[in-house]
């Protein structure tokens, strides 16, 4: 992240104010303030992650993934023989915090800030699947989009989607 000295000064002052406004996170803000003031390039890359951008298309895909899991769970709930499919297979796991942090952040934003998909269980890891999921979800979406009744799935269709 390239910043002018003036931009660094402004951001440093913002972190100083945040230290006073949010004492619970004061250490974090002091650390970031030091990084900005001293211009530590390696650590400034952390700010790139914090201030990164998630394109509209990616956001829509993540919402589509969450819609798919909503449809999977509702369809599974309506099955007469639910035992043929493990409930965990139709429960949204989230994304990997190590490799898909931006996607994970968006999921948490949608649930915790926007109030959507509040029925999803964040589990003990807060939607951190702890394994990369993007490719798997893409395969699942392709199968789901091919289903004629996306919100009234049969057991066979559910199995095809979760096994994609």
From Swiss-Prot:
SUPFAM superfamilies: YfbU-like
Pfam families listed in its UniProt record: YfbU
The organism's place on the tree of life at top rank: Bacteria
Entries under InterPro entries matching the protein: UPF0304_YfbU (IPR005587), YfbU_alpha-helical_sf (IPR023146), YfbU_helix-hairpin_sf (IPR023145)
Similarity annotation: Belongs to the UPF0304 family.
Name of this protein: UPF0304 protein YfbU
């Amino acid at each position: 992240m390239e910043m002018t000295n003036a931009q660094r000064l402004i951001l440093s002052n913002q972190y100083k104010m945040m230290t006073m406004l949010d004492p619970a996170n004061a250490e974090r803000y002091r650390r970031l303030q030091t990084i900005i003031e001293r211009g530590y390039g390696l650590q400034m890359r952390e700010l790139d992650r914090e201030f990164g951008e998630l394109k509209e298309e990616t956001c829509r895909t993540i919402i589509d993934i969450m819609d798919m899991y909503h449809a999977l769970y509702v369809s599974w709930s309506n099955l007469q023989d639910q035992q043929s499919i493990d409930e965990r297979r139709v429960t949204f796991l989230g994304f990997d915090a190590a490799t898909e942090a931006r996607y994970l952040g968006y999921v948490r934003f949608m649930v915790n800030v926007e109030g959507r998909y509040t029925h999803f269980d964040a589990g003990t890891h807060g939607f951190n699947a702890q394994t990369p999921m993007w490719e798997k979800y893409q395969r699942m979406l392709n199968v789901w989009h091919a289903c004629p009744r996306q919100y009234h799935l049969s057991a066979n269709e559910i199995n095809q989607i979760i096994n994609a």
